[in-house]
Swiss-Prot record:
Transmembrane segments: none annotated. Gene3D superfamilies: Farnesyl Diphosphate Synthase. The Asp-Asp-Xaa-Xaa-Asp/Glu (DDXXD/E) motif is important for the catalytic activity, presumably through binding to Mg(2+). Belongs to the FPP/GGPP synthase family. A motif (DDXXD motif) lies at residues 69-73. Disulfide bonds: none annotated. It catalyses: (2E)-geranyl diphosphate + H2O = (2E)-geraniol + diphosphate. The gene is TPS. GO terms for biological process: isoprenoid biosynthetic process; pheromone biosynthetic process. Its cofactor is Mg(2+). This is Terpene synthase. Binds 2 Mg(2+) ions per subunit. The keyword Transmembrane does not apply.
């Protein structure tokens, strides 16, 4: 909580305003974005005080985005507990999320670099462009191509990765270009999340079963199923229903398996894993990033 208080120092006010935000912090996530920042510092070698501020900024922006995502997606659970807006209401949750975004921008100013704010705004714009077009597809019922999906994902999921890297580069002597690696990681994280949402038991325990189907989301396996079987409209009709019926969702999962959509997704994940490792090696190797990639391979046990 200390790191969230604004410069006015009104702790009592902030405690009230930030209740929806601190609520989701009671069950910490995997801190993967903070781990990535520390991993990239193997190459960038910036001072710890700057690294810690960047890590705080990324975590604040990530967690605030989760509050908004859960409202936009009509989610029920987040990290195994009821979503914040089901406890504190939509209005307070939106305000808390927006407030934390500006607290994060205020923290960017503390980095005391003339380009830091511009970098932050650039990447937040990219993130919202990616998030926005994904919502547009869902709400207008337009199934994107895989290439359109990948561009959206690099903007949305890769946006915070690039924000961390670009902020760190402001204080580094390294001139390495990490754009390709950040894009690969963004794709890998999102496609892995799409796959695990439909296949991995622990996702069902922390969210509702196959939540992406209830949301009506054009996730990577869904896009493959719809695009590869244009004459079979079962999957797209199930998606249109935004169903909470577990039996219907289980049937959709069997269709995705039958259509080869899970197999295609696993092949894509394996390819992204290879590409990430090759890019890490090209950049000189990084044991911390390699360890993160190893940890992410839990999707492979769902075969």
């Amino acid at each position: 909580m200390e790191g969230l208080v604004n410069n006015s120092g009104d702790k009592d006010l902030d405690e009230k305003l930030l209740q929806p935000f601190t609520y989701i912090l009671q069950v910490p996530g995997k801190q993967i974005r903070a781990k990535l920042a520390h991993a990239f510092n193997y190459w960038l070698k910036i001072p710890n005080d700057k690294l810690n501020i960047v890590g705080e900024i990324i975590q604040m922006l990530h967690n605030s985005s989760l509050l908004i995502d859960d409202i936009q997606d009509n989610s029920i659970l987040r990290r195994g507990i009821p979503v914040a807006h089901s406890i504190y209401g939509v209005a307070s949750t939106i305000n808390a999320a927006n407030y934390v975004i500006f607290l994060a921008v205020e923290k960017v100013l503390r980095l005391e670099h003339p380009e830091a704010t511009r970098v932050c705004i650039d990447q937040l714009l990219e993130l919202h462009r990616g998030q926005g077009i994904e919502i547009y597809w869902r709400d207008n019922f337009q199934c994107p191509s895989e290439d359109e999906y990948k561009l959206m994902t690099i903007r949305k999921t890769g946006g915070l990765f690039m924000l961390a890297i670009r902020l760190m580069q402001l204080f580094s002597e390294s001139d390495a270009d990490f754009t390709k690696l950040a894009g690969i990681l963004g794709l890998y994280f999102q496609i892995r999340d799409d796959y695990c949402n439909l296949c991995l038991q622990e996702y069902s325990e922390n969210k509702s079963f196959c939540e992406d189907l209830t949301e009506g989301k054009f996730s990577f396996p869904i896009i493959h199923a719809i695009r590869s079987r244009p004459d079979d409209r079962q999957v797209i009709q199930i998606l249109r229903q935004r169903t909470r019926d577990v039996e219907v969702k289980k049937y959709c999962v069997t269709l995705l398996e039958k259509f080869g959509s899970f197999s295609h997704t696993r092949e894509t994940l394996a390819q992204l894993d290879r590409e990430a490792r090759e890019e890490v090696a090209r950049l000189g190797g990084n044991p911390f990033l390699e360890a993160i990639l190893n940890d992410l391979l839990n999707w492979d046990r769902t075969k």
